[in-house]
């Protein structure tokens, strides 16, 4: 397996010009595209329609090149968007290609990617053990597809799935189905948490008996160390992208991960880069930073609003949601190390690392 990685700048949620140019020059074979992970400039909430616009724009472009309908493109390629480019974060997409490769095997394991898609998640299943189990099954599928046999070789599992919307709440009401909440934005923690627990269950990080209906989005001491989950109203299924290093892969990249102990943890950023194989002293030089291909992180407000003993207003600000504060802060910290603000930073860390902490993964050139 040979995985390709291309970072695409976007001037607007509907801008697909950089991918169009790569296809035109032959740098990217559209038939090898398997996934796209990106940041759009919406609010990141239940009413963020920039994610759907971005997906449709890429689907329309690829439909022309693949001879498929936009809907068929969506079934063939996983699109994962996180809304919210606060602070220095730059709207962009990271494109992944995958193809068989009979070339010489590298001495070390290289980047591998597996994808798993769940069935449709009913509104009443959002944020429940049914969602957990569905994601765990998709994780098993993705592991097999990536050719990874040891969960320890997995460094990043990105999951995007549905949250509740007014329309899906109304659908559940018509059927008399019970929901975890009636608040669309309030359903995000439940959805993100259930998906993260699905990753933990699928990778064997957590035993099944520890996951019960009443602990989802409540008992944060149960978590995955490599899950990164996002929820949006544009999806009905959960899409699982599993990244790790596999012996049979011939990619030109490696992936590693670390933990951000809080929103200003520079050491955690460097930990992820070194885990991926980037060698540097202090902070990466400009030349070394060019070897960093992509960084993916989660962001969270400090527990009780206090950051290293100092009071913050992240949790008490009535004008700006704490997730937006956190994304802006974490994005700036990471960019100060990598020198590139085109970073995937997503808010909300329910069951994703220990309370107050957040996962971070990095892809570098091998």
From Swiss-Prot:
Residues 110-247 are annotated as: RU B. Substrate binds at residues 51, 82-83, 192, 230-231, 327, 346-347. Its EC number is 3.5.2.-. Residues 253-366 are annotated as: RU C. One of its GO terms (molecular function) is hydrolase activity, acting on carbon-nitrogen (but not peptide) bonds, in cyclic amides. It comes from the Bacteria. Keywords: Hydrolase. It holds the Pfam family Amido_AtzD_TrzD. Residues 1-103 are annotated as: RU A. Signal peptide: none annotated. InterPro entries: AtzD/Barbiturase (IPR014086), AtzD/Barbiturase_RUA (IPR043008), AtzD/Barbiturase_RUB (IPR043006), AtzD/Barbiturase_RUC (IPR043007). The active site is at 160, 230 (nucleophile). Cyclic amide hydrolase of unknown substrate specificity. Catalyzes the hydrolytic ring-opening of a cyclic amide. Does not act on cyanuric acid nor barbituric acid. Homotetramer. NCBIfam families: amido_AtzD_TrzD (TIGR02714). Belongs to the cyclic amide hydrolase (CyAH) family. The monomer structure is formed from three repeating units (RUs) that share the same structure as one another. The monomer and the active site possess nearly threefold rotational symmetry, to the extent that the active site possesses three potential Ser-Lys catalytic dyads, but one of the 3 active site surfaces varies in composition suggesting it is involved in conferring substrate specificity. This is Cyclic amide hydrolase. It comes from Azorhizobium caulinodans (strain ATCC 43989 / DSM 5975 / JCM 20966 / LMG 6465 / NBRC 14845 / NCIMB 13405 / ORS 571).
């Amino acid at each position: 397996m040979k995985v390709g990685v291309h970072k695409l700048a976007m001037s607007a949620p509907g801008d697909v010009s950089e991918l169009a140019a790569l296809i035109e020059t032959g740098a990217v074979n559209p038939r090898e595209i398997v996934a796209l992970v990106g940041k759009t400039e919406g609010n990141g909430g239940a009413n963020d329609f920039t994610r759907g616009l971005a997906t449709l724009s890429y689907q329309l472009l690829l439909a022309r090149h693949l001879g498929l309908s936009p809907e068929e493109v969506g079934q063939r390629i996983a699109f994962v968007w996180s809304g919210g480019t606060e602070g220095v974060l730059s709207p962009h997409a990271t494109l992944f290609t995958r193809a068989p490769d009979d070339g010489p095997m590298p001495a070390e394991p290289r980047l591998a990617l597996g994808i798993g898609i769940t069935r449709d998640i009913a509104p009443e299943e959002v944020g429940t053990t049914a969602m957990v189990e569905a994601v765990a099954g998709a994780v098993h599928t993705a592991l097999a597809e990536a050719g990874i046999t040891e969960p320890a070789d997995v460094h990043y599992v990105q999951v995007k799935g549905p949250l509740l919307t007014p329309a899906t709440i109304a659908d559940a009401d018509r059927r008399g189905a019970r929901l975890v909440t009636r608040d669309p934005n309030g359903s995000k923690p439940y959805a993100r948490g259930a998906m993260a627990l699905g990753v933990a269950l699928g990778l064997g990080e957590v035993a099944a008996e520890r996951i019960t209906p009443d602990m989802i989005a409540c008992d944060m001491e149960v978590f995955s160390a490599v899950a990164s989950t996002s929820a949006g109203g544009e999806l009905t299924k959960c899409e699982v992208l599993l990244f790790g290093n596999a012996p049979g892969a011939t990619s030109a990249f490696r992936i590693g991960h670390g933990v951000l102990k809080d929103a200003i943890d520079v050491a955690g950023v460097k930990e992820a880069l070194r885990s991926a194989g980037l060698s540097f002293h202090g902070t990466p030089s400009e030349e070394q930073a060019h070897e960093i291909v992509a960084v993916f992180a989660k962001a969270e407000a400090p527990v009780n609003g206090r950051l290293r003993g100092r009071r913050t207003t992240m949790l008490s600000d009535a004008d700006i949601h704490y997730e937006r504060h956190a994304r802006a802060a974490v994005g700036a910290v990471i960019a100060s190390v990598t020198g590139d603000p085109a970073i995937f930073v997503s808010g909300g860390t329910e069951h994703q690392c220990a309370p107050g902490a957040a996962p971070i993964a990095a892809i570098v050139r091998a």
